[in-house]
Structure formats: C-alpha cells, structure tokens
Amino acid sequence: MAQYSLEKCAEFAANPHLRAPLSAFTANPRMRDPALYRPSPELAEAVNVALHLGIPLLLTGEPGCGKTELAWHLAWYFHLGEPLVFNAKSGSSATDLFYQYDALGHFQYSQNHAEALSPDELERRFICYQALGVAIRSDGRRVVLIDEVDKAPRDFPNDLLDALDKLRFDVPELGKSYHTSDANRPVIVLTSNS
C-alpha cells in the first residue's frame, strides 16, 4: 500500500480537532470504498511531492480512470472527512470556488422588508460557501476536489492558480475577508479529462 506523508501525519494524529468523522464515506453509495483504492507508486510519489510542496495536484486522464477516487482516498487516508467538491462548468469563475451570493434573493427581500439585515443574517440567508471557501473557513485541514477543470472557461485556470496561491478571499457583500494558515492549508486535487 502506498504511504503518504503529510508532515508524516504527526500533526493530525496528535490533534483530534483535525480528524473528521469517516461516516460520510460509508454513507455515499456512489463512491467506491476509498480504503480499497491502490495508487501506483508513481502516483503516490506525485501525491507526496504535492503535499510536501503545498501545491495542488493536477490529475489528467480518461473519464473513469480513478482521478476523483484519489481525492476520496486521500481524505480517508488522512482522516480529513468527506472531500469538498467543486464541479467546474462552462460558466465557472474563480470566485465560484469560494462562495455564491444570491443577489436576486437579497434584492427581493429588501423590496419586501424595510429593516436592513445584520451581516450575520445576510450571510445566513444569501451567502452559500463553496468547496474552497468552506475549506478556508474550516478549523482543520480538508481535501478539496476541483473536478473537470477542462470544462471551465479558458481564463479559469489562471484565475484558479492565483486563488489557490493566496488561499484567501473577500466577501464584499459582508465586508469580510477570510484566509487560512499553512497548518490548515487544504489538500487540493484538480482533475481534467484532457
């Protein structure tokens, strides 16, 4: 079995707050058992290099060859909970990785209610955090799967690299900024079919 090194996993073994429950893996019948996934030695080495350098891992290959399953396997292996998944689409932008703002819903609400919402209420009602936003706001390390980046617009990869490099984002609607520490840097797996 391949052995990975996330700083030899010592931080995770020593800190129970960084270990997420594994029930999500058994509750999702669509995914194969991540404990049974067996990466090649070359793939295990690529994972170790990406983890050591703190950079995203880009996996390319034909549909069904196991790219997505690697993210599930890594989450299982490091006890990081269910991977946070972002499925790239033809209209995706880098901002979509962090959050979505329901501007129309907020507008409709403001037309029907005279009182202004508090930032917390605005966030609760009209902001939906996405995979990378959830990971950055998380108290522990997570696996983020950015699936099928080849389906996104041509400028998406450049915007994505910038977003992944900074691991911070602003929510101007709330006047808030979020960032993560190196200790909580998410394990990021990108997949592409081409």
Regions found by a protein language model. Give the residues of each.
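AAA+ P-loop NTPase catalytic core and its hallmark functional loops
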Residues: 1-194
